[in-house]
Amino acid sequence: MKFDTMLAIGIGGFIGAILRAYTAGLVNSAVKHDIPFGTLSVNLIGSLLLGMFIGAIQYGGIQNPYIKSMLTTGMMGAFTTFSTFAVESFFLFKNALYIQALSYILLNVIGCIILAGAGFKGIEAILK
């Protein structure tokens, strides 16, 4: 991988990580619940946005390879978080919050797939 591509990914990652911390913190401070809604919200928002970015890339709305890498691998890669989702799911089970754990897992997995598809199809409808 070329250095300039890695730099673009790093810039996107910097932006995505800051946006993730801010968004998750904002949601967690507003919503007090056993389910970690901060992580859920960044995963759902990130899946929607990634679907939109991939749609824009596929249909020619985003052509610059550095912008592609910055937005997808960098920004959305840092904004969303599978590892935190996994650890939070583990602790919900560990604390015997089985309904919350299963709800959290289903909301993440199914919600993210639906929103990624919706983002892609929305951009497809605009750019196709």
Swiss-Prot record:
It comes from the Bacteria. Na(+) binds at residues 77, 80. It is found in: Cell inner membrane. GO terms for molecular function: fluoride channel activity; metal ion binding. The keyword Cell membrane applies. InterPro entries: FluC. It catalyses: fluoride(in) = fluoride(out). It is a multi-pass membrane protein. Na(+) is not transported, but it plays an essential structural role and its presence is essential for fluoride channel function. Fluoride-specific ion channel. Important for reducing fluoride concentration in the cell, thus reducing its toxicity. The chain crosses the membrane at residues 7-27, 37-57, 73-93, 96-116. Belongs to the fluoride channel Fluc/FEX (TC 1.A.43) family. GO terms for biological process: cellular detoxification of fluoride. One of its GO terms (cellular component) is plasma membrane. This is Fluoride-specific ion channel FluC. Keywords: Cell inner membrane, Cell membrane, Ion channel, Ion transport, Membrane, Metal-binding, Sodium, Transmembrane, Transmembrane helix, Transport. NCBIfam families: crcB. The keyword Isomerase does not apply.
